[in-house]
């Protein structure tokens, strides 16, 4: 008779969100432009408490975004996640990170499938399990949002992101 050890893996599951409100303008985005909250002040968006402890491994198992814009051509965007805060381009500037910042990228989540209503739209990343790791002394990740298509925003457009995280 052989005995095999039983292996149980338990995950601490959390849902984390962030909100980004665009500037009060309607300047069109080009492919690879940064979507940000300011045209003059650059900063990455902190996604706090991704890890329960510093340096924790996590899996992103779902990513969703809603927008207050019901555009005929919805935005296709990517959420770039870093384990240390990168310098950020301002809104509508070309997305450009340094080689050093590229070394701190822990994942990129494309959100390109959108549905719309007459008042808003919603996108999601499909079937994913993206393993990430927080920095050794941090429980947060830092996000930059990048347009992947030419996109006509509305003034003060609000993007709300939700991330489903499994802490391992």
Language-model segments: residues:
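Surface-exposed, low-hydrophobicity beta-strand/loop segments enriched in small/polar/acidic residues
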Residues: 2-168
């Amino acid at each position: 008779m052989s005995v095999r050890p039983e292996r149980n893996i338990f995950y601490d599951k959390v849902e984390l969100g962030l909100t980004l409100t665009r500037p009060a303008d309607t300047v069109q985005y080009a492919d690879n432009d940064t979507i940000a909250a300011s045209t003059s002040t650059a900063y990455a968006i902190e996604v706090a408490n991704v890890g329960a402890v510093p340096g924790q491994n996590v899996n992103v198992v779902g990513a969703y975004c809603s927008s207050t814009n019901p555009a005929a051509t919805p935005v296709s965007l990517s959420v770039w996640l870093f384990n240390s805060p990168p310098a950020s381009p301002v809104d509508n500037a070309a997305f450009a990170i340094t080689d050093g910042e590229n070394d701190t990228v822990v994942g990129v989540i494309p959100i390109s499938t959108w549905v719309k209503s007459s008042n808003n739209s919603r996108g999601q990343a499909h079937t994913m399990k993206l393993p990430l790791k927080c920095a050794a002394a941090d429980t947060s990740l830092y996000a930059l949002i990048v347009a992947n298509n030419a996109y006509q925003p509305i003034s003060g457009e609000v993007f709300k992101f939700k991330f489903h995280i499994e802490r391992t």
